From Swiss-Prot:
[4Fe-4S] cluster 1 binds at residues 12, 49, 83. Catalyzes the methylthiolation of N6-(dimethylallyl)adenosine (i(6)A), leading to the formation of 2-methylthio-N6-(dimethylallyl)adenosine (ms(2)i(6)A) at position 37 in tRNAs that read codons beginning with uridine. It comes from the Bacteria. One of its GO terms (biological process) is tRNA methylthiolation. Binds 2 [4Fe-4S] clusters. One cluster is coordinated with 3 cysteines and an exchangeable S-adenosyl-L-methionine. Monomer. Residues 3-120 form the MTTase N-terminal domain. The keyword Amino-acid biosynthesis does not apply. This is tRNA-2-methylthio-N(6)-dimethylallyladenosine synthase. Belongs to the methylthiotransferase family. MiaB subfamily. Its EC number is 2.8.4.3. One of its GO terms (cellular component) is cytosol. It comes from Yersinia pestis. [4Fe-4S] cluster 2 binds at residues 157, 161, 164.
Amino acid sequence: MTKKLHIKTWGCQMNEYDSSKMADLLASTHGYQLTTIPEEADLLLLNTCSIREKAQEKVFSLLGQWKLLKEKNPQLIIGVGGCVASQEGEQLRQRAPCVDVIFGPQTLHRLPEMINHVQGTNSPVVDISFPEIEKFDRLPEPRAEGPTAFVSIMEGCNKYCTFCVVPYTRGEEVSRPSDDILFEIAQLAAQGVREVNLLGQNVNAYRGATYDGDICSFAELLRLVAAIDGIDRVRFTTSHPIEFTDDIIDVYRDTPELVSFLHLPVQSGSDRILTMMKRAHTALEYKAIIRKLRQARPDIQISSDFIVGFPGETQQDFEQTMKLVADIHFDTSYSFIYSPRPGTPAADLPNNVSEEEKKQRLHILQQRISQQAMEISRKMVGTVQRVLVEGTSRKNVMELAGRTENNRVVNFEGSPDMIGKFVDVEIVNVYASSLRGILLRTEDQMDLRTHESPQSVIARTRKENEIGVGIYQP
């Protein structure tokens, strides 16, 4: 009888990536098949996030529901991973004794052994250690699920912003070797992936070892990824302003595969608050980065993260944030009310901004950025946009949907054979969360790089010397 696995994932794209790797790993080692129905599962895994306080409380609420399933099926194994698991450790089992396996973001590759331990001894296991890069060496080969894919290139963060738990839950920065990353992306490209999104908590701090013992910078990695045959779009998230160096900006100047969209968190427009957050940059320095980016790529759109109601934030501080929002003209944002996280320096600061004031500031900020996003969308009407077709439209299965470089969803009429390929569409209408397009040309009418085999490369590069002997010059 086939064993079933149900995974619930909360949090960032890195968690989504980790969950997909867990599913692949357990399919290869134990034959588990994914199910969307928890009641069918033999193994329940919860991949958690501890960035927000509410997300942490949601963990124990869901575990209360899963406890009822375990009472009906004592053989059911329940595992909790991710940042809450890393932060809580053994204390998690004290609040939720139904949990059998507790693992951190850096130990998910040990899940098969942990599950075997539980099955063999009927006792729980906890492993929230930080074995650095080991997890990537023990994960199965990548498996494409559509034309886009996430690839983790580094983990952890050394910045220790006063509000953030990431350095404590995912450890300090560790970069994967560049050759491993390029090989994984080449494997995905061979399976039809056209767009790759490079992941890391502080992705532009990447410094990976090369095969010859040198160090590959993030800018160098971007160019190498863009050169992989079949990869026509490159994205990355999430980056930090103090690591956004001029050599990265130069890649925007000369590498068209790198999309004209950047998520660059700033958190606040007040230098005083930025100092209290230990962000190590000013609002003016952030604006200077954006100015240089727009010189290199005039059509680039910027999104960001904001925290409102940070301890000590005054009305003047908030107004400086709103001024930055207007100056940069952000496209989208992920904005939140400050939530103190246990163990972080900011948690010890007096939280002297009222809840009512926090909610009002958040509403003003989100409303302004939504207005700016709509202005940008309206300016796209009449333009031709290259869209990567991801599948059928959510609202009408007779239509197709894809994404522009600046991450707008476009719905248009087309044929199923366009899925997984690029098309050019003219934008003709704007809606709250999508655009309407008319198909202009398909991929076979574009000058994109074709997939090449070793034989085609040899044939293309073959030359003959003076006596007619074939030589090859790659």
